[in-house]
A protein has these predicted regions:
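Surface segments flanking catalytic/ligand-binding clefts of nucleic-acid enzymes
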Residues: 3, 82-202
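Short gly/ser-rich loop at a beta-strand->alpha-helix junction or flexible surface loop bordering the NTP-binding
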Residues: 1-105, 140
């Protein structure tokens, strides 16, 4: 069989997957699923070999997740897959074009309009979705800030045209003294360079 779905995502290095999710295999013939292993029939797949295991390609994996998972879970998982592999949304769109008629394909465009591999964690994905659903334009992710030629910071997301940054602060930003010190320095400099910083807490 071929590793697919979350199993393929895992072998491609995707983080933050559900450790209790059933393993997923696809085969050209029909085989019954067994406890802990979900087996599906899929005669045409784009595959590759990862560490000696045959798996669906990153693009095929993302396409399959986008058409089978609930919307927010699909966005979060495809974000993480793109972050881990460097996969681009256009590559998934190209595969979708080649896969017309596939079951669930109608869900794929909605997922891909909101996917961004720049998200470095699920909370960053959730923050981005909250901003968009509040009526704001889709933010750019991983914005690099310079003072002349000197690198100052990389922000989680924001809008360059308005010089507004949004930072998701996990628990460590409040509990780690060294991290707090870095944050104080960072957030003192950015306004001096003309940036407004909005901090979202865990």
């Amino acid at each position: 069989g071929v590793l697919a779905g979350v199993s393929a995502a895992a072998v491609h290095g995707t983080r933050w997957l559900d450790p209790d999710a059933a393993a997923e295999l696809v085969r050209a013939d029909h085989v019954r699923s067994v406890p802990g292993i979900s087996v599906r029939r899929a005669p045409k797949l784009e595959t590759c070999v990862v560490d000696g295991m045959v798996a669906t390609t990153p693009a095929q994996t993302a396409f399959d997740l986008a058409r089978r998972m609930p919307l927010d879970q699909a966005i979060e998982t495809v974000d993480a897959l793109c972050n881990a592999t460097g996969l681009k949304v256009c590559e998934i769109e190209e595969l979708a074009t080649r896969s017309k008629g596939a079951h669930g394909i109608g869900a794929v465009p909605r997922v891909l309009t909101l996917v961004d591999g720049g998200a470095a964690s699920p909370p960053e994905t959730h923050t981005r979705l909250l901003l968009v659903r509040a009526g704001l334009p889709l933010p750019e992710t991983q914005i690099e800030i310079f003072d002349g030629d000197e690198f100052v910071a990389r922000a989680d997301m924001g809008w360059k045209q308005w010089r507004v940054l949004v930072e998701y602060d996990g628990v460590q930003h409040w509990t780690d003294p060294a991290q707090r010190t870095r944050d104080v320095d960072r957030y003192a400099v950015l306004p001096e360079l003309g940036w407004t910083v909005l901090r979202v807490g865990a």
